[in-house]
Amino acid sequence: MEENARRIMELVPNLRPVEFVPVAALIGVYEELVFRGFLMTRLRRATGGWTIAMILSTVVFTALHAFEQTPSALVVVAILSLVFSLVTIWRRSIIPAIIAHALFDLSQFLLLHLQAGDSWK
């Protein structure tokens, strides 16, 4: 199993697949409210534009995921952060980013569960 999967499984070792849905939803809601809803909008006001606000909030978002991710996975985290930021700006709502984030997290948890087989119950 790759290093990144091992690290994530250590964070959530006792979750059953049915418990992934509320966890994924809560993570998506929390992170999007903090990083896109609060931080990015405040940075836009402070910098006068969305581009710098997106970049700065992505740097913070990625840095805070560094303890649980490998360097190569951090690239994916940064790209996802930019995508969620663009969706928020484009739709003028944080709701689509929350849904996308929750669905992504749910898919990752389920893939890890399938990859782990019987060793992760």
Report residues per predicted region.
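Juxtamembrane helix-loop-helix connectors linking adjacent transmembrane helices
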Residues: 1-27, 45, 113, 118-121
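Juxtamembrane/transmembrane-helix boundary motifs in multi-pass membrane proteins
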Residues: 11-15, 19, 45-49, 64, ...
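Residue-level hotspots within the lipid-embedded alpha helices of multi-pass solute transporters
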Residues: 12, 24-29, 33, 74, ...
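Hydrophobic alpha-helical transmembrane segments of multipass integral membrane proteins
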Residues: 18-27, 31, 56, 60, ...
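Active-site His/Glu-centered metal-binding helix of metallohydrolases
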Residues: 29-34, 38-39, 63, 67, ...
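Membrane-interface helix/loop boundary segments of multi-pass membrane proteins
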Residues: 30-56, 86-93
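Small-polar-interrupted transmembrane alpha-helices in polytopic inner-membrane proteins
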Residues: 50-65, 81
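Functionally important transmembrane alpha-helices
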Residues: 62, 70-121
